[in-house]
Structure formats: C-alpha cells, structure tokens
Amino acid sequence: MWIASKFGFFSIVRKGEGKCHVRARIREDLENLIAASGVEAEILTWDESDYRHRVIVKESVVEKVMATLAETLDYDNFKNKIIDTPSQSDKASTYGEIWSMMYSYQSA
C-alpha cells in the first residue's frame, strides 16, 4: 500500500509470514515515521532496490504506525499541510500531480 502523509511517502508490503517492509525513497521520511510512532526499528539502506530505505518489522509494528497516522491527523487539507511542513514541502508539486491524475479517473 502507498501512504502519503505529513511524515513522508511510504510503500508497505508483506514479505513472508508476519513480516512487513515499510519502504521509503527518502531516509528522512522513515526517520520521521519512527520518531512519531515511537517504534524501534533499524533503517536499512539497499542501494540497488526500488525503494532504497526500509525497515523490516512485525505486523504489530505496522498496526502501531497506522494508529499513529490516524491519531496525528491534524489538518483539513493534505496538500496545504505538505506545503507547510518543512521536511515535506518539496513533495507538494508531486502530490499535486498525483491528485490531478487520480482526479481524472473521477471525472471520466
């Protein structure tokens, strides 16, 4: 699943029984997510991977991360929140493009 949040952009996938990879293109995004959720996880960097940075965690950690995302929801407009968040503002135009592309499905 892809998650775009005020902490960063992530891809979460299941890799084997009970294990998940929380992946990011930018290390700081994982650092933000770990700090916000209070989980303990080692960030691994795999230079040859599609998503360079990741943590490998139990499903229960992903559940805690998802709860943190819900509990820290403090905005009524995602794009504006990204613009106002220094560690994420450089992603604003990209998120705008994603919004526009997905809007075209709604309009079709």
What feature does the model see in each segment?
Residues 1-108:
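Structured alpha/beta or helical-core interaction and ligand-binding surfaces enriched in interleaved
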